[in-house]
């Protein structure tokens, strides 16, 4: 999403090629982006995030996601492949929903077993 807002790569054009009903954003991802917008004091970024939140579904992080998060986090820790709490939550969310995660951070997310990832950059 951050690349689409910045106009980097092919992200924005790939997003608009999909109907909004086929897309969603994790509430965790939205929170991470809101944090960045506040750190930058960027009203422009907040307006872009408002538009995204009105256009696509914002998926809530629920109890099933929390259970998946615990399982994935423990497995990654056992293997010494920790990717950070936020990325683990995002991965758990995608797995719980059974969706493909769109990311440019394949280095981290490829460590999560069974997670489908695609890079639209």
Model regions: which residues?
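Short, well-structured N-terminal submotif of metal-dependent ribonuclease cores
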Residues: 1-25, 35-56, 78, 107
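Short, C-terminally biased terminal segments at protein or domain edges
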Residues: 107, 117-121
């Amino acid at each position: 999403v951050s690349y689409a807002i910045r106009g980097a790569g092919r992200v924005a054009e790939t997003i608009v090629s999909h109907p909004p009903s086929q897309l969603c954003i994790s509430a965790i991802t939205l929170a991470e982006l809101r944090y960045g917008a506040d750190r930058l004091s960027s009203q422009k970024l907040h307006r872009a995030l408002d538009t995204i939140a009105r256009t696509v579904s914002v998926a809530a992080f629920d109890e099933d996601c929390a259970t998946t998060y615990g399982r994935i986090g423990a497995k990654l820790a056992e293997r010494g492949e920790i990717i950070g709490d936020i990325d683990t939550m995002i991965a758990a969310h995608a797995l719980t929903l059974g969706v493909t995660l769109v990311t440019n951070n394949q280095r981290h997310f490829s460590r999560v077993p069974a997670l489908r990832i695609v890079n639209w950059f």
